[in-house]
Amino acid sequence: MMTDITACTLDCPDCCSLLVSVDPSGDIHIRGNPEHPFTAGFTCAKIRHFGKRLKNPLRKVHPMVRVRGRWEPIGWNHALDLCAEHIQRLRNNPLSMLHIQGEGAKGVLKQAGRYFFSQLGTSCVRGSLCDAAGYVATVMDFGSRENNDITDLLNAGYIIIWGRDVLRCSIHTAAIVGQARQNGASVLSISPGDDANSRFADRAITIRPGTDRFLAAAVIRLFLERNVTAPDIGQYAHRWNEFVRFIFSRSMESLIAACDVSQEDIDTIYRYYSDTKPAATLIGTGLQRYRHGGENVRFIDALAFISGHVGRSGGGIYYHLHSLRNLNFAWSRSAKTLSGRILRFPCIGQDIIDAADPPIRMMWVNGSNVINQAPDSHLIGRAFETVQFKVVVDAFMTDTASRADLFLPSTLMLEQEDIVSSYLHNYIQHAKAVVSPPGEARTDFWIFSQVGKRLEPPVILPDAETFFRCALSTDRLSISFEDLKKQNFIKVKRPSVAYAGMKFDHSDGKFRLPARLHSQEPVPDKFRLRLITPVSRDHIHSQILVDNHRLPLIVQVSSGCPYLADIDLSKDLYLVSPLQKLKVKLELSDRLHPEAAVLRRGSWMMTGGGVNQLIAARITDIGCGAAYYEQYVRIEN
């Protein structure tokens, strides 16, 4: 049984190197590559069972067109001609076409869709359903977005896991944290609770959801009160004196009350950051999914900065990096790019409906189950109905694909060649195609290339190898595409310590401190529980096989929740927002804040799930991110 080396292209930070083999019965076996320094021979359950996704009988592997409300088969040539006809008809009015691309898969060739539609000058989306507020916050603070090398965590004396479920988010980060703890590091977990960090943490602090900025500000105030900031810290910061006055304008009592912790909790966090041993901070994306999510991240950044743990080995701030930062994407900007219209991803339903002069008449969706994954799913569904022609490229009949007019079957990971990089570590990897695609499934790159040739004038995409060679042409790499295929992966040359010597990437070299601390908005009278929809251990976003859906959905609340007194737990239960309600099963936890309700995301509307039906579309303070966790709900019979 031959074994091939390839790489994971799912939307996961670990970007594992994989060993893949197919036995005589056709079963696909996947394991982590022991020769890869980061993957180190193990991978997560999502990957180990991925072969079942490839061979699932409900996978759609032939093009289909909707005719009088019913799906009918269509040949590829006819399907591509149909796409080209609709694009050609609207080409003189390109803003009437909308391209939506998500992060269903990573890789160089996955950028071909953005390249293709940018040449047409169509409408597109901006913002993010993931990490935009936190990403922009870190750039505002540091002048760029860099982390210490992830393995530098092994040099930490203290590790603060702030709003990140390391085991569910990144199994390799969890392993590194576990090893650091064995080496003597002390680990503190801060969150609204119900994460898997208890097995790593020496201490856990449970806070009111969305109030991380007040907690960080309280600890900063304690540093300033005791005058124990890092030596000469003021000379490394822009407007330091103004920041000090600003912090002292807020009382310690008000800050503590806002985040619902004790003075003892503040003292504990202070001890972790005030010691001379380096303290590393791992920031999760959940805490930036609030209206003031960017502000949450900025105050945590400020705490790490003023305590002297930035720019040193064993310290630093760890947040999502850009998955394309180690590759050259000049090819995507080399041709003339026309000016298009931009719609907001987090509010895509309302923005489609509001689009005028011209309205959206054609839509192309790839790499995204947008109706399921973006807020206010029903509104997005209604917006889709206003669009005359909708193309969805996918492998399954998802909540989004089921509303298309033309369905084009895509290849999946292991069936398509690409080059992929990580938003956690610094390895570039060749993702070899190691399994033949079923039926008539085709790559996104092939589809765009074929449609482009049918246009007049044509939109010609260079061949895949040209894109690969260009992507590898960067000062941080010295490897050819041929050599990368031979050795499978290479580590990019980057400093192991970010911002060493407190040298930041703003023009004056100084760190930027937050200047405002917004109060929390009042809690709605009839909806008192803050809805949190974190990741699952078993699947990426909504990439769940239909037979793996479990109903009713499980919602977790605190065993001390004060809002269950009038609920009959023996009867049917519903999670309710002003938009919609879902039937749920209640699970009580003693590790969750009393004002939080946790329902893990990804379930499909068509199977009775779909938590984003409950969540109104809101924008974060910076970055045009989706403020999912600003939604309040209640539980009722």
Language-model features: locations:
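Conserved short loop/turn motifs at secondary-structure junctions
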Residues: 98-106, 258-261, 284-291, 368-370
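Generic, well-ordered alpha-helical scaffold segments in large soluble proteins
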Residues: 82, 86, 115-119, 180-183, ...
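A glycine-rich, hydrophobic/aromatic-adjacent loop/helix-cap motif
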Residues: 273-356, 495, 502
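N-terminal export/assembly segments and adjacent metallocofactor-ligating motifs
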Residues: 1-226, 262-263, 362, 562, ...
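Acidic/polar loop patches that form or flank catalytic/metal-binding clefts of enzymes
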Residues: 28, 230-231, 266, 280-281, ...
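N-terminal leader/propeptide and maturation segments of large enzyme subunits in energy/redox metabolism
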Residues: 69, 228-262, 435-495, 571-578
